[in-house]
Curated annotation (Swiss-Prot):
GO CC, alphabetical: cytosol; glycine cleavage complex
Residues with PTM N6-(pyridoxal phosphate)lysine: 704
E.C. no: 1.4.4.2
Protein name in UniProt: Glycine dehydrogenase (decarboxylating)
Catalyzed reactions: N(6)-[(R)-lipoyl]-L-lysyl-[glycine-cleavage complex H protein] + glycine + H(+) = N(6)-[(R)-S(8)-aminomethyldihydrolipoyl]-L-lysyl-[glycine-cleavage complex H protein] + CO2
SUPFAM superfamilies: PLP-dependent transferases (SSF53383)
InterPro entries referenced in this protein's UniProt entry, alphabetically: GcvP, GDC-P_C, GDC-P_N, GDC_P, PyrdxlP-dep_Trfase, PyrdxlP-dep_Trfase_major, PyrdxlP-dep_Trfase_small
Coiled coil: none
Cofactor(s) annotated in UniProt: pyridoxal 5'-phosphate
Source species: Bacteroides fragilis (strain ATCC 25285 / DSM 2151 / CCUG 4856 / JCM 11019 / LMG 10263 / NCTC 9343 / Onslow / VPI 2553 / EN-2)
Transmembrane segments: none
Length: 949
């Protein structure tokens, strides 16, 4: 392999390292290991037919060429996406900082205090601006947040409503079309009927359970919904409002006029449009609905010594716990973008946010009056940033379009011939003059350029916001760049990311996010593209999307791809809806059961339920494989109604099951489809693939297998790949005149992430991708060989090897010493490591996945750490350490405890803080001691203002 290729930088072990590792494993070669790990009948017969790999320099030139094909016109289309200004201090120190973008979801509280605080800021800003008491720390986008709101309100129906079968949700006709489309996709399988119309004309019938409104609406008009909301509540209907969060700096927030749920996007709080995403959706609601709200919630708690700290609260609501009983399948969301939006509000504060909103509104007022003088009638009586014009008889929309395009301007064109525009943070006086000139030329009239636009408003007193927001001190302390930079740095020092050490989370694939892959995201031609611009303006994006789709087809062995799903869970849902649409097309729509192994991740059953199926659980045998007898029995028992099998491969237990082809054949013989969960695709690429194995559809996690970052809990991308017969049923989009199964707001989902995966594939090439897979399997088996004689490995494949991850046995340790897998996980923090996956998929164990990116020296240091912890466990077992006071049950040890004048433990400070030599050279200090989870759930405090009595 050429040394100037990315593979040499991405893969952590070299040939000499591999030989050492193979000897430890007990095989003669890497090929022998792979042959003994992956069943021969599913091995690909030829290398992947991918383009030759590019060097990093060649890719930089190639991606710049693609970016150059994108035409960055000034866009006023609006409809949920707006140009914005990302403060350089946030772009440089957060968006482009691997400490922030390579970290994992903050389940491990003690090594996540920085991003937990940043997400708490986000929640607080959302609560303040919406005037709601509770918010989560992001959803995927506005449209999916709307669908979650409808599902949540459906679950909140009163007993009488449930008994009466109330199943109608009213959607005001002036909602964004992409939002209505996604709600429709989610509502149909739940048995929810959608009724659209004018909110003023609605009759509250007994079958109605909820209403969804847009504020300001899709035309830009800010309606006064107070009377309507009162009527809805009188009729026992809940009200959800899609609100432009920046407009709430000036408009009366929905929380003040009775909304039950407020949702939307925070894209315009400093996040670029990225041709549709990623950006953080938001969701706020009443306190009494906290256990029904989808998504993750950050709350306050205390550590064991009483120090205030943050944690993820009410986790038992989530799909990985509740499985088929979950009311949402949301998992990965948009944590990195929520973090950026939170920092945006911190940096600007109340005054800055109000000034930005006021400037936008003032320019809009100026344009309404100035364009109105040219003979155009503006229809919105109350508005924030959006105008809709009826054209005079002498002017056509096509004339306007032609003139606008000649000035490199995009406007919004309505089906009835009206023309609209939405002003944003980047609009200045010069831009306003250009807009004015477009309408003047079309009308054949002169206009006077202006040098300044005074502050003005048309918002009535009834709709004008009177209450303060962002009043917590965090929103007033960091308005200089120096203070902001130091605040961000102060937070990132509290977190473990890949910049610190290996993150061995099983089933999460925390691999390198190479700088060469990440750089294109800071390119304006990729950052600043609106998703609804004419296709020729996005030629670079479209070419990249086409190329990437073709490459993913090759890698998966499938015929079609949709890049629309914004996460793995969204991919699962999209894949199941695709299966449903296909079955209905062949007269098999009655099939409503999905077979799922007991070992599956909780998103599988949660997604199946959301897609309108019922689940049937299939047992696993003592070796961790699908119990074939139980599978056959369940398939036969349900064959007339069986729609699909959902299966992860290699299994969630980290094993390549030898019967996988037969499993697919059994399901197909019943007339059902095989859905392969691609969470473990990192063990397949180049060696086998879902299509070759016999699956019909799979989703991929770009943030796992294909090198896009986790971002502390998103953004993720979950494209689905399907066999030929399913291609016609892939998610569509209104932009293409086909809204079937639409699952996200933007036509290509989080398109801004795609250059990362495209770069990964283009720079790795077929040989590099295949070697990455082999090395991931090598690294996992090396760790298994090093740890098998102490902890023990729970499951192995037919020939005694694991796949790309393995499950470490900890149950016997607990039986003998009382030391739990959680104690081991917390002790790892003292050594500078993030915990592996706890108690999944087997309770009382740790699941470890090292990925191909780690070096032998890092793997050996991790082994030394685990063996040293093993010795610490033996000290407890042998009575050398106190069972009630030892380094494990007291872990982690924060700096403030170690340097305290009081030290009353039975072991030394050195043993607590510097257990091995490598820690002395690279010590990570936790900021808090072990956190009290019960306290944080017993009293949920989800904003910066919260405190304990």
């Amino acid at each position: 392999m050429k040394t100037d290729l990315l593979a040499c930088r991405h893969i952590g072990v070299n040939k000499a390292d591999a030989e050492v590792m193979l000897r430890k494993i007990g095989v003669a070669s890497l090929d022998e290991l792979i042959d003994k790990t992956i069943p021969a009948n599913i091995r690909l017969k030829a290398p992947l037919a991918l383009p030759a790999p590019m060097t990093e320099y060649e890719f930089a030139r190639h991606i710049a060429e693609l970016a150059g094909k994108n035409k960055l016109f000034t866009t006023y289309i609006g409809m949920g996406w707006y140009n914005t200004i990302t403060p350089a201090v946030i772009q440089r120190n957060v968006f482009e900082n691997p400490v922030w973008y390579t970290s994992y979801t903050p389940y491990q509280t003690e090594v996540s205090q920085g991003r937990l605080e940043a997400l708490m800021n986000f929640q607080t800003a959302v609560c303040d601006l919406t005037a709601m008491p509770l918010a989560n720390c992001s959803l995927l986008d506005e449209a999916t947040a709307a669908a979650e709101a409808v599902t949540m309100m459906y679950g909140l129906r009163s007993r009488n409503q449930q008994k009466a079968g109330a199943n109608v949700v009213f959607i005001d006709e002036n909602i964004f079309p992409q939002t209505l489309a996604v709600i429709t996709t989610r509502a149909i399988p739940q048995g929810i009927e959608i009724r659209t119309g004018k909110f003023r004309d609605l009759e509250f019938t007994d079958d109605l359970f909820a209403c969804v409104l847009q504020y300001p609406n899709a035309n830009g008009n800010a309606e006064d919904y107070r009377e309507f909301t009162e009527k809805a509540h009188t009729a026992n209907c809940k009200v959800a409002v899609a609100a432009d969060i920046l407009s709430l700096a000036l408009l009366t927030p929905p929380g003040e006029w009775g909304a039950d749920i407020v949702f939307g996007t925070t894209q315009r709080l400093g996040t670029p449009m990225f041709y549709g995403g990623p950006s953080a959706g938001y969701f706020a609601t009443r306190d009494e609905y906290k256990r029904n709200m989808p998504g993750r919630i950050i709350g306050w708690s205390k550590d064991k010594y009483g120090k205030l700290c943050y944690r993820m609260a009410l986790q038992t609501r989530e799909q990985h716990i509740k499985r088929e009983k979950a009311t949402s399948n949301i998992c990965t969301a948009q944590a990195l973008l929520a973090t950026m939006a939170g920092f945006y509000t911190v940096y600007h504060g109340q005054e800055g946010i109000r000034n930005i909103a006021s400037r936008i509104h003032s320019i809009t007022v100026f344009l309404e009056k100035s364009i109105g003088k040219l003979g155009f009638k503006q229809v919105n009586k109350q508005y924030f940033d959006t105008l809709r014009f009826i054209l005079p008889d002498s002017v056509s929309a096509q004339q306007i379009r032609t003139i606008a395009l000649s000035k490199e301007v995009n406007l919004r064109y309505f089906d009835n011939g009206d023309v609209g525009l939405s002003i944003d943070e980047t609009t200045d006086v010069a831009a306003a003059n250009i807009l004015l000139s477009i309408f003047a030329i079309a009308a054949g009239k002169d206009f006077q350029k202006v040098d300044d636009i005074p502050e003005a408003t048309i918002i009535s007193e009834e709709l004008k916001r009177q209450t303060p927001y962002l009043t917590h001190e965090v929103f007033s302390k960091y308005h200089t760049e120096t203070e902001m930079m130091r605040y961000i740095k102060r937070l990132d020092r509290k977190d473990i990311s890949l910049a610190q050490s290996m993150i061995s989370l099983g089933s999460c694939t925390m691999k390198l996010n190479a700088a060469a892959e990440m750089l294109p995201l800071s390119c304006a031609e990729f950052m600043c593209m609106h998703p609804l611009v004419p296709e020729d303006q996005a030629a670079g994006y479209r070419e990249l999307i086409h190329n990437l789709s073709e490459e993913l087809k090759v890698i998966t062995g499938f015929a079609g791809v949709s890049l629309q799903p914004n996460s793995g869970a969204a991919g699962e849902y999209a894949g199941l809806r695709t299966i449903r649409a296909y079955l209905e097309s062949i007269g098999q729509g009655h099939r409503n059961k999905v077979l799922i192994p007991a070992s599956a991740h909780g998103t599988n059953p949660a997604s199946a339920i959301q897609a309108g199926f019922t689940t049937v659980t299939c047992a696993c045998d003592e070796h961790g494989n699908v119990d074939m007898d139980d599978l056959r029995a369940k398939a036969e028992e349900n064959k007339d109604d069986l729609a699909a099998l959902m299966i992860t491969y290699p299994s969630t237990h980290g094993i390549f099951e030898t019967e996988i082809v037969e499993i697919c054949q059994i399901i197909h013989a019943c007339g059902a489809q095989v859905y392969m969960d691609g969470a473990n695709m990192n063990a397949q690429v180049g060696l086998t693939n879902p299509g070759f194995i016999g699956a019909d559809v799979c989703h991929l996690n770009l943030h796992k297998t294909f090198a896009s970052p986790h971002g502390g809990g998103g953004p993720g991308v979950g494209p689905i790949c399907v066999a030929e017969h399913l291609v016609p049923f892939l998610p569509g989009h209104g932009l293409f005149g086909n809204s079937q199964n639409e699952v996200s707001a933007a036509p290509f989902g989080s398109a801004g992430i795609l250059p990362i995966t495209y770069g990964y594939i283009r720079m790795m090439g077929a040989e590099g991708l295949t070697m990455a897979t082999k090395t991931a399997i090598l690294n996992a088996n090396y760790l298994a060989a090093c740890l098998k004689d102490t902890y023990g490995i729970v499951y192995r494949g037919a020939n005694g090897f694991v796949g790309h991850e393995m499950i470490l046995e900890c149950r016997k340790v607990y039986e003998e010493t009382g030391i739990s897998e959680n104690d081991i996980a917390k002790r790892l923090m003292d050594y500078g490591y993030h915990a592996p996956t706890l108690s999944f998929p087997v309770h009382g164990t740790l699941m470890i996945e090292p990925t191909e990116s780690e070096s032998l020296s890092e793997l050996d240091n991790f082994v030394l750490t685990m063996l040293t912890i093993w010795n610490e466990i033996q000290e407890v077992k042998n009575g050398e350490a106190d069972k009630e006071d030892n380094v494990l049950i007291n872990a982690p040890h924060p700096e403030y405890e170690v340097v305290s004048d009081q030290w009353e433990h039975c072991y030394t400070r050195e043993k607590a803080a510097y257990p091995i030599e490598s820690v002395r050279e690279n010590k990570f200090w936790v900021n808090v001691a072990r956190v009290d989870n019960t306290l944080g759930d017993r009293k949920l405090l989800p904003t910066c203002y919260g405190c304990f009595d």
